[in-house]
Amino acid sequence: MRWIGKVGEEDLDPKLLMWDLHRHVDPALVPPGRTVVSFRFNDVPAKIRDWWLVMTAEEVDVCDFDPGYDVAVSVTGSLRRMVEIWRGDLGWPAAIRSGIIQLDGPERFRRAVPKWFPASQFAQVRRSAVDMTFWLAS
C-alpha cells in the first residue's frame, strides 16, 4: 500500500472526508450525552460547505444539514487543509496555532477535537521519497 503523491482539486470531496471522520471517532472519548461538532469548509460551494457530526457513546452520525442540536464546537477551514490533517500531512496543533483551522467553542471541546478526529490510520503508511518529493515540491 502507498499514498498518492499530491491530492488534486478533483480529489477533494467533503462527503468522503466527513464519512471517514465519522467512522473513526472513538466513542470512548466522546462526553456523555450528545455532542455536536459543526464543520465549515470555506473553500467549497455553499451547497456542500456545512457538515455536522452528532456523536454519542453509541453512535456517530454525519449530517449535511443542520440537525437542530446545540453545537459544542465548530471547526472552520479549507477542505484541502482538513484533508491534509486527515492524511497526516498537517498536524492539528500546527493548523490551529497558525490559524489555518479555527475552533470555536468551550476550551474543553476545542482541546478534544484532535483526539476525536485523529489522522487516518493510513497516515502511518510510509511514503516513498518520490511521493514526499512531489508533495514537498508543490
Predicted regions and their residues:
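Acidic, aliphatic-rich amphipathic alpha-helical segments
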Residues: 1-61, 107-138
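Short, flexible, solvent-exposed loop/turn segments with mixed acidic/basic and small polar residues
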Residues: 27-28, 61-64, 89-93
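N-proximal short alpha-helices
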Residues: 55, 65-68
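C-terminal interaction segments
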Residues: 68-138
